[in-house]
């Protein structure tokens, strides 16, 4: 299948020099692409370029063959949903957070319908991560970009989220996941992009 994204000779500058420099890679439209590497290698920065939460200082990011800067940024962010490693909850119930399709979406991410009326700030971290995924899926994205989605979870919760990510990747979604855990590349990924820190 064709590429969903292409990074072309990317450079992103930080306070102490480039965070990423001369980076090129493709993200396939099918399955799960895992971006793996140690802390400080620029993985999260690369993820944030996909929906313009950050822009490169040099180079291009192409989405379906077009520079991401050519898209309306709100439409780009609807199509490319980013879920951070710390799930964000808004005031109100789980249903308020997820939106009008809450019942179906909660079932899709493995949350019991009874949780819909619970205050979102009373969820466990694992439940909140699933809720954040449900909220993003409710935007009907083409791409789900996940930043270390299991890093704050206990072992039992990690397994459930990893299984859910794998199921989503087997649907029509493009799923991109940043991780520092090598086993995600070997056990979960269809495609792997390895990022190394600048020396």
Which residue stretches match the model-derived regions?
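Helix-to-loop junction immediately C-terminal to a conserved catalytic motif
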Residues: 51
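Conserved ABC transporter NBD signature motif
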Residues: 59-67, 76
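Conserved ABC ATPase "signature" region
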Residues: 102-115
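Conserved ABC ATPase signature
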Residues: 119-123, 127
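Hydrophobic anchor residue at the start of the ABC signature
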Residues: 133
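Catalytic Walker B motif of ABC-type/P-loop ATPase nucleotide-binding domains
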Residues: 144-148
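H-loop/switch region of ABC-family ATPase nucleotide-binding domains
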Residues: 179-180
């Amino acid at each position: 299948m064709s590429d969903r994204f292409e990074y072309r000779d990317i450079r992103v500058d930080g306070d102490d020099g480039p965070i990423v420099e001369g980076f090129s890679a493709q993200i396939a439209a099918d399955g799960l692409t895992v971006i793996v590497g140690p802390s400080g290698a620029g993985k999260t920065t690369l993820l944030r370029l996909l929906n313009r939460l950050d822009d490169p200082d040099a180079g291009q990011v192409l989405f379906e063959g077009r520079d991401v800067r050519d898209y309306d940024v709100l439409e780009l962010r609807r199509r490319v949903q980013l879920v951070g490693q710390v799930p964000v909850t808004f005031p109100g119930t789980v249903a308020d957070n997820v939106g009008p399709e809450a019942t179906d979406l909660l079932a899709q991410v493995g949350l019991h319908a009874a949780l819909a009326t619970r205050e979102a700030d009373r969820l466990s971290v694992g439940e909140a991560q699933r809720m954040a995924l449900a909220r993003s899926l409710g935007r009907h994205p083409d791409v789900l970009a996940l930043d270390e989605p299991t890093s704050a979870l206990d072992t039992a919760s990690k397994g459930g989220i990893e299984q859910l990510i794998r199921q989503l990747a087997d649907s029509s979604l493009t799923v991109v996941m940043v991780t520092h855990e090598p086993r995600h590349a070997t056990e979960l990924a269809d495609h792997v992009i390895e990022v190394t820190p600048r020396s």
